[in-house]
Amino acid sequence: MKINFFNSTLLAGLMISAVACKQASKPAQETTTKTDSAKTIVAKVADTSNTADVFNNYIGLKNQFLRSNMKGIKSTAAMLEDKLAGIKGCTETATLAHQIATSDDIKAQREAFLILNKDIIGLIKGSKFKSAPIYVDFCPMADNGKGGYWLSVNKAIENPYFPEHMKTCGQVKEQIN
């Protein structure tokens, strides 16, 4: 019953995550909007003040998945959830991190991580966050052969989806920065 509930929640999260972090994943730019009083307001899109913290916690989480370290996965996901909650538009992505932090099933955690990666990649690509090169990696075997992405700071492939059996399965698809 718990697994079915979690899978249902995960499926709902997948649908919702398509729009999660949407505001934060767009490049910062000025937009204008008209109010009822016909005044023009200039607003900044994408508050990326916590993006570096999110990225550092994300890399920590990915590294815990490489070790299949349940305790480390839970604690790092909780820290990531906290940082995501501080970014406007990332509520659903924070919920995915919460699901990872509270689950006792590593397979379910990896499924949530698969979805979370889509939002984190969008957030990093759309932000002004700069670091050493960041690589978007891809494993064609993840997600039952549909494939899955993750971020890395190393060019060498270290697959967080199959660290025990196919640690080097995958390829670099893109370099950010």
Task: List the predicted regions and their residue ranges.
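Amphipathic, charged alpha-helical segments and their helix-to-coil junctions
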Residues: 131-177
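C-terminal motif of bacterial Sec signal peptides marking the signal peptidase cleavage site
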Residues: 17-20
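Bacterial signal peptide processing site
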Residues: 22-25
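Small-residue-enriched alpha-helical segments and adjacent helix-cap loops
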Residues: 113-120, 139
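Short, intrinsically disordered, charge-biased short linear motifs at domain edges
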Residues: 6-7, 116, 122-129, 153-158
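Post-signal peptide N-terminal segment of mature Sec-exported envelope proteins
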Residues: 30-53
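Bacterial N-terminal signal peptides that target proteins for export
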Residues: 1-10
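Surface-exposed, polar/charged faces of alpha-helical domains
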Residues: 49, 56, 60-82, 86-95, ...
